[in-house]
Every structure is written in structure tokens, then in C-alpha cells.
A protein has these predicted regions:
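N-terminal, membrane-interfacial amphipathic/helix-forming hydrophobic leader that caps
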Residues: 1-68, 72, 76, 217-231
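Short helix-terminus and kink motifs of transmembrane alpha helices
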Residues: 18-23, 61, 97, 101, ...
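Short alpha-helical transmembrane interface motifs in multi-pass membrane proteins
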Residues: 32-36, 47-48, 81, 85, ...
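Peri-membrane helix termini and adjoining interfacial loops of integral membrane proteins
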Residues: 60-63, 103-117
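Interfacial segments of alpha-helical transmembrane regions
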Residues: 74-95
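Transmembrane helix-loop-helix hairpins at the membrane interface
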Residues: 89-98, 109-231
């Protein structure tokens, strides 16, 4: 079990290192395109951290079974479960999203929510940066974040603190790792909670990877289209 605690620590260390690299590049006053490209490529390398248990000697089969990177009922069925679970959770998500946004506007007296870093990056005119962002959102995030937050963290906490605390706790860390503004943190946390429930339902992260990938694909594509039209 200690290998999975180490995995979480190694992942966050890698994630923090990428952030520090970004600050260092800003201090060095490199061009925005170079800054974004280097940081995004470095974030791709963080994907290697999910293999920490394997690097420490755990058999691949055992690692995959622990984190849920398998489909004992069949891959097609798990993909279908991911799509159905995502669609069902979106009904809850949209209701809560509307409530959160309404409360925000009341509290902040109609001030619009702060734009996120991802919005700024997606506004880049550099094709390489856009490709890196799109692949990070639609490939890296479903694989790495689901393996870490639902496959490792949720799984580790589930047997120790129960379903509710494990789902909420892993969703909270998932949201905070994104570093968004408060409103966006709540919405990302709600996604994380839904993914945790899908993980509990299926005993696999394949459906959560599908749900995560579909969500990020739709959102990122929509943002690219909107920013392209507004540009």
C-alpha cells in the first residue's frame, strides 16, 4: 500500500515542479510561446509518475488491477458505462452549476467570474501550443488524473474512510490541483465527485477515463471555437 502513497506524492512533486518551471521561465522573461511549449511538454512527462509502483517492482498486472485500469466485464461495456454515467451525472452537474453561478453573481454583485489560465492558453496563435493543450485535456488528463485521483487516491481512501469521505476528499484534491478560481473549483470538484461514483459503481477507471475524456473534448473544442470566432 505504501507504493500508492508514494505514487501520489511523486505525482504532486512532478506537478509542482512543472509549476516552478513555469515561474522560472517567467522570471527569465522568455517569449510566451516558448514558455507555454516548455511547460506543456514538461506536463506530459508527469504522466510517467503513474508508473511509480511498477518502477518500484510491482507487477504490471497487479498494478492495473489495483488502480482499476482493466475491464473485466469487457471494454465495450465499460465504455458504454462511462458514457451513461457521464450523461446521468451531467443532469446533477448542470443544476448545481447554475446554482453556484447564481450565488456567485449575488455575492460578487454581478461581477463575471475570473478567466482561467486555460482560457488564456487556448487563445494562443501558436498551433503547437494548441495541439499540446488539446492533447493534454483529451488524452493526458483522462489517463493520468483518473489513474491518480480515482485509481489510486480514491481507492486508497475508500477502504479506510468509506465511500462518502473518499469520494469528496479525492474530488476536493482533484479540484484544487487545477488551481482555478473559486467558482471553477466547485464545478471541477463536482466532476471529480461524479467520476468517483462511477469508479465505485464499475470497479474500473476505464469508464471514468471515457467520461473525463468526453467532457474535456466537448469543453475544449467549444472553447477553441468560441475563442476562434471572437478572435
Amino acid at each position: 500500500q505504501i507504493l500508492f502513497v508514494e505514487t501520489i506524492a511523486v505525482f504532486f512533486a512532478g506537478f509542482l515542479s512543472v509549476r516552478l518551471l513555469g515561474f522560472a521561465l517567467e522570471a527569465a522573461k522568455v517569449s510566451p510561446d516558448v514558455h507555454e511549449t516548455v511547460v506543456l511538454v514538461a506536463q506530459w512527462l508527469v504522466a510517467l509518475t503513474i508508473l511509480w509502483p511498477v518502477a518500484r517492482g510491482m507487477p504490471v498486472r497487479e498494478w492495473r488491477r489495483y488502480v482499476g485500469l482493466w475491464a473485466p466485464r469487457g471494454l465495450a461495456r465499460e465504455i458504454g458505462a462511462g458514457l451513461c454515467g457521464y450523461a446521468a451525472w451531467m443532469l446533477v452537474y448542470f443544476v448545481i452549476a447554475m446554482l453556484v453561478v447564481m450565488v456567485y453573481y449575488v455575492v460578487r454583485q454581478n461581477q463575471p467570474p475570473q478567466s482561467s489560465r486555460i482560457t488564456e492558453v487556448l487563445g494562443s496563435n501558436n498551433p503547437l501550443v494548441l495541439v499540446l493543450v488539446f492533447t493534454l485535456a483529451t488524452m493526458w488528463a483522462p489517463l493520468v488524473e483518473e489513474t491518480i485521483f480515482r485509481g489510486t487516491l480514491y481507492r486508497y481512501w475508500r477502504v479506510r474512510v468509506g465511500l462518502g469521505a473518499a469520494a469528496v476528499g479525492s474530488a476536493a484534491l482533484f479540484a484544487m490541483a487545477h488551481g482555478y478560481a473559486p467558482v471553477q473549483l466547485v464545478l471541477v470538484g463536482m466532476l471529480g465527485l461524479g467520476f468517483a461514483l462511477i469508479r465505485e459503481w464499475r470497479g474500473s477507471i476505464v469508464p471514468t477515463m471515457v467520461a473525463h475524456g468526453v467532457h474535456n473534448f466537448v469543453v475544449t473544442t467549444a472553447m477553441l471555437v468560441i475563442l476562434g470566432l471572437s478572435g
